[in-house]
Amino acid sequence: MGNALNLRVRRTLTIVAVALISCIFVGNARAVEPAHTLLILGDSITWGANYKGFGNVTPKLQALNTFDTVIVDGAFSRNISGPAKTLENGVKTYAKYLKTKVRPSAVIVALGSNDLQGSIKVRYYEDRIRELLTLIGDIPVVWVNVSRIDSQYYIRASPVFNKVLNRVALDYPNVSVVDWHTMISANPKWFAFDKLHLQPVGYRARATLYVELAQNLWNVVVPITTTTTTTTIVAATTIPG
């Protein structure tokens, strides 16, 4: 009788031990946070903000010690979508990242200036903005609006694009718009001689803006992950009880 009881006790303890080990393994596996990637997708203004002699923004972003990976991708003449002088527009560039398994946790979009050529077409702007936002999906996005003063046409076109951007962003809860147009209008000396690109002081200001936006985006990304992970761990560790 005693031997049978001891055998049952040993079997019960073995089952409990296995359950505890399994629970701890699952809990720890789920507790590992995924790597977070920030992508800044822009044109020549972003290139200048990242150039070592101007804004040098990449090391400043890394110094935040927030996102595990920071990608600053700025290319001359890049537009949002459609034909471009540069090799890849914004949509194609983002699709390329997805194809190579780069999955950004948050995105700063700084495009639109090179989509103003031709004529002022509200539907044209809207279609391209929506195309990129749809591709990006539901991760946090900040879009920096545009400002060009290199001709009367661009002075008129920039606010139209920005108005369309503001309206479209309302349809995407994960998207916010930053008003670069107002910032640089208050600091016209940031513009270079061509009234399109920037002086070094302007690129430094743009880099500072990117750093601020990156910190804000991190504060959005982290609570989502932390809340989910905490809930999962609590649920897992309460199973044995």
Residue ranges, per PLM feature:
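Conserved SGNH/GDSL esterase-like catalytic core that processes O-acyl groups on lipids
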Residues: 33-41, 45-127, 150-152, 159-160
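Extracellular/periplasmic envelope-modification machinery, especially enzymes
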Residues: 20-21, 28-31, 59, 63-82, ...
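N-terminal secretory targeting modules
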Residues: 1-41, 45-52, 64-66, 100-105, ...
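Active-site flanking residues adjacent to catalytic metal/cofactor-binding acidic residues
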Residues: 41-43, 144, 178
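Catalytic-core regions built around general acid/base machinery
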Residues: 128-136
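Catalytic His-Asp segment of secreted/periplasmic serine-dependent ester chemistry enzymes
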Residues: 149-233, 238-240
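Conserved beta-strand segments of the P-loop GTPase G domain that flank and frequently precede/overlap
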Residues: 109-111, 142-145
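A short helix->loop->beta-strand "cap" motif at the edges of active sites that frequently abuts
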Residues: 137-141
